[in-house]
Amino acid sequence: MPWIQIKLNATNENAELIGDMLMEETGALSVTFLDAHDTPVFEPLPGETRLWGDTDVLALYDAEADTQLIMSQIKASNMLAEGFAYKIEQLEDKDWEREWMDNFHPMKFGQRLWICPSWRDIPDPTAVNVMLDPGLAFGTGTHPTTALCLEWLEGLDLSGKTVIDFGCGSGILAIAAIKLGAEKVIGIDIDPQALLASKDNAQRNGVADQLDVYLPQDQPEGLLADVVVANILAAPLRELSSIIKGLVKPNGQLAMSGVLDTQAEDVANYYRDELHIDPIVEQSEWCRISGRKQG
Protein backbone atom coordinates (compact mmCIF):
# COMPACT_ATOMS: atom_id res chain seq x y z
CA MET A 1 0.00 0.00 0.00
CA PRO A 2 1.18 3.59 -0.53
CA TRP A 3 2.42 5.79 2.31
CA ILE A 4 2.34 9.46 3.22
CA GLN A 5 5.57 11.19 4.23
CA ILE A 6 5.72 14.56 5.98
CA LYS A 7 9.08 16.33 6.08
CA LEU A 8 9.71 19.14 8.57
CA ASN A 9 12.80 21.29 8.88
CA ALA A 10 14.07 21.62 12.44
CA THR A 11 17.15 22.53 14.45
CA ASN A 12 19.25 20.07 16.38
CA GLU A 13 17.89 21.53 19.63
CA ASN A 14 14.31 20.45 18.97
CA ALA A 15 14.53 17.69 16.35
CA GLU A 16 14.27 14.80 18.82
CA LEU A 17 11.40 16.45 20.72
CA ILE A 18 9.56 16.96 17.44
CA GLY A 19 10.16 13.32 16.56
CA ASP A 20 8.68 12.21 19.89
CA MET A 21 5.66 14.47 19.36
CA LEU A 22 5.05 13.08 15.86
CA MET A 23 5.09 9.51 17.17
CA GLU A 24 3.02 10.11 20.31
CA GLU A 25 0.49 12.74 19.20
CA THR A 26 0.07 12.43 15.43
CA GLY A 27 0.33 8.66 15.01
CA ALA A 28 3.48 8.54 12.89
CA LEU A 29 4.54 4.99 12.08
CA SER A 30 8.21 5.94 11.98
CA VAL A 31 10.42 9.01 12.31
CA THR A 32 13.79 9.53 10.63
CA PHE A 33 16.34 12.32 11.07
CA LEU A 34 18.35 13.52 8.07
CA ASP A 35 20.89 16.28 7.66
CA ALA A 36 19.26 19.03 5.60
CA HIS A 37 22.60 19.66 3.86
CA ASP A 38 23.74 16.05 3.36
CA THR A 39 26.63 16.44 5.80
CA PRO A 40 27.57 13.14 7.50
CA VAL A 41 28.46 12.96 11.18
CA PHE A 42 30.69 9.93 11.82
CA GLU A 43 32.65 10.87 14.92
CA PRO A 44 31.38 13.83 16.96
CA LEU A 45 33.94 15.58 19.11
CA PRO A 46 33.53 15.23 22.88
CA GLY A 47 30.48 17.17 24.03
CA GLU A 48 29.08 17.62 20.54
CA THR A 49 25.53 16.58 19.66
CA ARG A 50 25.03 13.74 17.21
CA LEU A 51 22.38 15.66 15.26
CA TRP A 52 23.13 18.37 12.71
CA GLY A 53 22.53 22.09 13.05
CA ASP A 54 19.83 21.97 10.37
CA THR A 55 17.85 18.73 10.48
CA ASP A 56 14.99 17.33 8.39
CA VAL A 57 12.51 15.25 10.38
CA LEU A 58 10.70 12.70 8.20
CA ALA A 59 7.50 11.11 9.51
CA LEU A 60 5.78 8.21 7.76
CA TYR A 61 2.00 7.59 7.90
CA ASP A 62 -0.37 5.16 6.24
CA ALA A 63 -2.22 6.33 3.14
CA GLU A 64 -5.49 6.97 5.02
CA ALA A 65 -3.96 9.48 7.45
CA ASP A 66 -5.64 12.90 7.67
CA THR A 67 -2.81 15.25 6.74
CA GLN A 68 -4.82 18.38 7.60
CA LEU A 69 -5.38 17.08 11.12
CA ILE A 70 -1.72 16.09 11.44
CA MET A 71 -0.54 19.54 10.34
CA SER A 72 -2.91 21.23 12.79
CA GLN A 73 -1.51 19.05 15.59
CA ILE A 74 2.03 19.95 14.58
CA LYS A 75 1.22 23.67 14.57
CA ALA A 76 -0.57 23.40 17.92
CA SER A 77 2.55 21.87 19.48
CA ASN A 78 4.36 25.24 19.10
CA MET A 79 7.63 23.38 18.56
CA LEU A 80 8.30 25.00 15.20
CA ALA A 81 8.56 28.65 14.28
CA GLU A 82 5.66 30.32 12.53
CA GLY A 83 5.80 29.69 8.79
CA PHE A 84 8.02 26.62 9.21
CA ALA A 85 9.03 24.68 6.09
CA TYR A 86 7.36 21.35 5.42
CA LYS A 87 6.61 18.99 2.56
CA ILE A 88 3.88 16.36 2.20
CA GLU A 89 4.26 13.63 -0.39
CA GLN A 90 2.79 10.25 -1.23
CA LEU A 91 5.25 7.39 -1.55
CA GLU A 92 4.32 4.60 -3.91
CA ASP A 93 4.37 1.07 -2.64
CA LYS A 94 7.46 -0.82 -3.76
CA ASP A 95 9.28 -4.06 -3.24
CA TRP A 96 11.67 -2.36 -0.82
CA GLU A 97 13.84 -5.46 -0.40
CA ARG A 98 14.36 -5.64 -4.16
CA GLU A 99 15.01 -1.87 -4.32
CA TRP A 100 17.62 -2.26 -1.58
CA MET A 101 19.29 -5.20 -3.29
CA ASP A 102 19.42 -3.36 -6.62
CA ASN A 103 21.61 -0.68 -5.00
CA PHE A 104 24.49 -3.10 -4.42
CA HIS A 105 26.82 -4.18 -7.20
CA PRO A 106 30.19 -5.98 -7.34
CA MET A 107 33.02 -3.58 -6.49
CA LYS A 108 36.62 -3.83 -7.67
CA PHE A 109 39.60 -2.83 -5.53
CA GLY A 110 43.03 -2.60 -7.07
CA GLN A 111 43.81 -4.91 -9.97
CA ARG A 112 42.30 -8.22 -8.90
CA LEU A 113 40.06 -7.99 -5.82
CA TRP A 114 36.26 -7.99 -6.08
CA ILE A 115 33.65 -7.75 -3.32
CA CYS A 116 30.41 -9.31 -4.60
CA PRO A 117 26.90 -9.59 -3.09
CA SER A 118 25.69 -13.18 -3.20
CA TRP A 119 22.78 -12.38 -5.53
CA ARG A 120 25.05 -10.90 -8.22
CA ASP A 121 27.05 -12.75 -10.86
CA ILE A 122 30.82 -12.71 -10.31
CA PRO A 123 32.26 -10.35 -12.95
CA ASP A 124 35.62 -12.14 -13.20
CA PRO A 125 35.81 -15.77 -11.99
CA THR A 126 39.61 -15.68 -12.35
CA ALA A 127 39.97 -12.74 -9.94
CA VAL A 128 40.10 -12.76 -6.13
CA ASN A 129 36.42 -12.74 -5.16
CA VAL A 130 34.97 -12.15 -1.70
CA MET A 131 31.25 -12.89 -1.42
CA LEU A 132 29.71 -10.55 1.16
CA ASP A 133 26.15 -9.34 1.61
CA PRO A 134 25.43 -5.87 3.02
CA GLY A 135 24.41 -5.85 6.67
CA LEU A 136 23.15 -3.29 9.13
CA ALA A 137 26.27 -2.62 11.16
CA PHE A 138 29.47 -3.78 9.52
CA GLY A 139 31.56 -2.88 6.51
CA THR A 140 30.87 -4.12 2.97
CA GLY A 141 33.33 -2.05 0.94
CA THR A 142 31.04 0.84 0.10
CA HIS A 143 32.61 3.27 2.59
CA PRO A 144 35.85 5.03 1.58
CA THR A 145 37.66 3.79 4.71
CA THR A 146 36.99 0.15 3.84
CA ALA A 147 37.91 0.79 0.21
CA LEU A 148 41.22 2.38 1.24
CA CYS A 149 42.12 -0.65 3.36
CA LEU A 150 41.08 -3.15 0.69
CA GLU A 151 43.18 -1.38 -1.94
CA TRP A 152 46.17 -1.39 0.41
CA LEU A 153 45.83 -5.11 1.13
CA GLU A 154 45.44 -5.87 -2.57
CA GLY A 155 48.75 -4.16 -3.26
CA LEU A 156 50.71 -6.31 -0.78
CA ASP A 157 52.31 -9.72 -1.20
CA LEU A 158 50.54 -11.59 1.60
CA SER A 159 51.74 -15.06 0.66
CA GLY A 160 52.46 -17.07 3.80
CA LYS A 161 51.98 -14.07 6.10
CA THR A 162 50.02 -13.57 9.29
CA VAL A 163 47.52 -10.68 9.28
CA ILE A 164 45.60 -9.05 12.13
CA ASP A 165 42.32 -7.26 11.38
CA PHE A 166 41.96 -4.97 14.41
CA GLY A 167 38.28 -4.02 14.63
CA CYS A 168 37.20 -6.72 12.20
CA GLY A 169 33.47 -5.91 11.95
CA SER A 170 32.06 -8.02 9.10
CA GLY A 171 35.43 -9.64 8.52
CA ILE A 172 35.69 -8.13 5.05
CA LEU A 173 39.36 -7.16 5.44
CA ALA A 174 40.27 -10.44 7.14
CA ILE A 175 38.58 -12.53 4.44
CA ALA A 176 40.13 -10.44 1.67
CA ALA A 177 43.57 -10.96 3.24
CA ILE A 178 43.09 -14.74 3.26
CA LYS A 179 41.87 -14.74 -0.33
CA LEU A 180 44.89 -12.63 -1.27
CA GLY A 181 47.25 -15.29 0.06
CA ALA A 182 47.66 -14.77 3.81
CA GLU A 183 48.39 -18.00 5.65
CA LYS A 184 46.66 -17.02 8.88
CA VAL A 185 44.42 -14.11 9.87
CA ILE A 186 43.28 -13.00 13.33
CA GLY A 187 40.21 -10.81 13.76
CA ILE A 188 39.85 -8.72 16.92
CA ASP A 189 36.74 -6.75 17.88
CA ILE A 190 35.06 -5.46 21.04
CA ASP A 191 31.62 -6.53 19.72
CA PRO A 192 30.78 -10.25 20.02
CA GLN A 193 28.31 -9.83 17.14
CA ALA A 194 31.17 -8.71 14.92
CA LEU A 195 33.09 -11.87 15.72
CA LEU A 196 30.05 -13.97 14.81
CA ALA A 197 29.59 -12.02 11.57
CA SER A 198 33.26 -12.44 10.67
CA LYS A 199 33.20 -16.20 11.21
CA ASP A 200 29.91 -16.58 9.35
CA ASN A 201 31.20 -14.60 6.37
CA ALA A 202 34.46 -16.54 6.41
CA GLN A 203 32.47 -19.79 6.36
CA ARG A 204 30.50 -18.57 3.33
CA ASN A 205 33.79 -17.85 1.58
CA GLY A 206 35.32 -21.20 2.48
CA VAL A 207 38.14 -19.72 4.58
CA ALA A 208 36.87 -20.18 8.14
CA ASP A 209 39.74 -22.53 9.03
CA GLN A 210 42.24 -19.72 8.41
CA LEU A 211 40.47 -17.12 10.56
CA ASP A 212 40.58 -16.93 14.36
CA VAL A 213 38.56 -14.23 16.13
CA TYR A 214 38.93 -12.81 19.63
CA LEU A 215 37.58 -10.19 21.96
CA PRO A 216 40.53 -7.97 23.02
CA GLN A 217 40.67 -9.49 26.50
CA ASP A 218 40.79 -13.01 25.05
CA GLN A 219 43.50 -12.60 22.42
CA PRO A 220 46.64 -14.72 22.92
CA GLU A 221 49.57 -13.16 24.76
CA GLY A 222 52.44 -12.05 22.59
CA LEU A 223 50.28 -11.90 19.46
CA LEU A 224 52.29 -10.56 16.49
CA ALA A 225 51.61 -10.26 12.77
CA ASP A 226 53.45 -9.39 9.59
CA VAL A 227 50.56 -7.14 8.56
CA VAL A 228 48.06 -5.28 10.76
CA VAL A 229 45.07 -3.34 9.46
CA ALA A 230 42.85 -1.24 11.74
CA ASN A 231 39.79 0.39 10.19
CA ILE A 232 38.24 1.96 13.28
CA LEU A 233 38.14 5.69 14.21
CA ALA A 234 40.62 8.40 15.09
CA ALA A 235 39.95 8.38 18.85
CA PRO A 236 40.64 4.65 19.43
CA LEU A 237 43.59 4.77 17.03
CA ARG A 238 45.11 7.40 19.32
CA GLU A 239 44.08 5.78 22.60
CA LEU A 240 45.17 2.28 21.55
CA SER A 241 48.29 3.26 19.62
CA SER A 242 50.66 1.41 21.96
CA ILE A 243 48.58 -1.77 21.71
CA ILE A 244 48.27 -1.57 17.92
CA LYS A 245 51.99 -0.89 17.44
CA GLY A 246 52.72 -3.83 19.70
CA LEU A 247 50.89 -6.20 17.34
CA VAL A 248 53.21 -5.44 14.42
CA LYS A 249 56.36 -7.53 13.96
CA PRO A 250 59.67 -5.71 13.35
CA ASN A 251 59.69 -4.76 9.65
CA GLY A 252 55.96 -5.54 9.56
CA GLN A 253 53.38 -3.26 7.97
CA LEU A 254 50.42 -1.38 9.42
CA ALA A 255 47.50 0.43 7.78
CA MET A 256 44.83 2.45 9.58
CA SER A 257 41.68 4.19 8.42
CA GLY A 258 38.47 5.61 9.83
CA VAL A 259 40.35 8.90 9.99
CA LEU A 260 39.21 12.21 8.50
CA ASP A 261 41.69 14.36 6.60
CA THR A 262 41.66 16.91 9.44
CA GLN A 263 42.69 14.18 11.91
CA ALA A 264 45.27 12.28 9.86
CA GLU A 265 48.49 14.09 10.82
CA ASP A 266 47.62 14.01 14.50
CA VAL A 267 46.87 10.28 14.42
CA ALA A 268 50.02 9.56 12.39
CA ASN A 269 52.13 11.32 15.02
CA TYR A 270 51.13 8.67 17.56
CA TYR A 271 52.88 6.05 15.40
CA ARG A 272 55.98 7.84 14.10
CA ASP A 273 58.11 6.74 17.05
CA GLU A 274 58.02 3.12 15.87
CA LEU A 275 56.99 3.26 12.21
CA HIS A 276 58.22 4.88 9.04
CA ILE A 277 54.98 6.51 7.87
CA ASP A 278 54.09 6.47 4.16
CA PRO A 279 52.46 9.44 2.42
CA ILE A 280 48.88 9.71 3.67
CA VAL A 281 46.27 8.64 1.09
CA GLU A 282 42.94 10.48 0.96
CA GLN A 283 39.57 9.53 -0.52
CA SER A 284 36.41 11.61 -0.07
CA GLU A 285 37.76 13.36 3.06
CA TRP A 286 38.79 10.04 4.63
CA CYS A 287 42.40 8.94 4.94
CA ARG A 288 44.59 5.89 5.14
CA ILE A 289 47.73 6.02 7.26
CA SER A 290 50.24 3.26 6.60
CA GLY A 291 53.82 2.49 7.42
CA ARG A 292 56.48 -0.09 8.20
CA LYS A 293 57.69 -0.85 11.70
CA GLN A 294 61.36 -0.28 12.31
CA GLY A 295 63.43 -3.45 12.52
Curated annotation (Swiss-Prot):
CDD domains (alphabetical): AdoMet_MTases
The family this protein is said to belong to: Belongs to the methyltransferase superfamily. PrmA family.
Record lineage: Bacteria, Pseudomonadati, Pseudomonadota, Gammaproteobacteria, Vibrionales
Main EC class the enzyme belongs to: transferase
ATP-binding as UniProt keyword: no
GO MF annotation terms: protein-lysine N-methyltransferase activity
E.C. no: 2.1.1.-
Binding site for S-adenosyl-L-methionine: 146, 167, 189, 231
Signal peptide: none
UniProt keyword Cell cycle present: no
Protein name, per record: Ribosomal protein L11 methyltransferase
Catalytic activity, as annotated: L-lysyl-[protein] + 3 S-adenosyl-L-methionine = N(6),N(6),N(6)-trimethyl-L-lysyl-[protein] + 3 S-adenosyl-L-homocysteine + 3 H(+)
Organism: Vibrio vulnificus (strain YJ016)
GO CC, alphabetical: cytosol
Main location: cytoplasm
InterPro entries per record: Ribosomal_L11_MeTrfase_PrmA (IPR050078), Ribosomal_PrmA_MeTrfase (IPR004498), SAM-dependent_MTases_sf (IPR029063)
Function: Methylates ribosomal protein L11.
Keyword list, A-Z: Cytoplasm, Methyltransferase, S-adenosyl-L-methionine, Transferase
Gene expressing this chain: prmA
Compartments in which it is found: Cytoplasm
Pfam families, sorted: PrmA
Alphabetical GO biological process terms: methylation
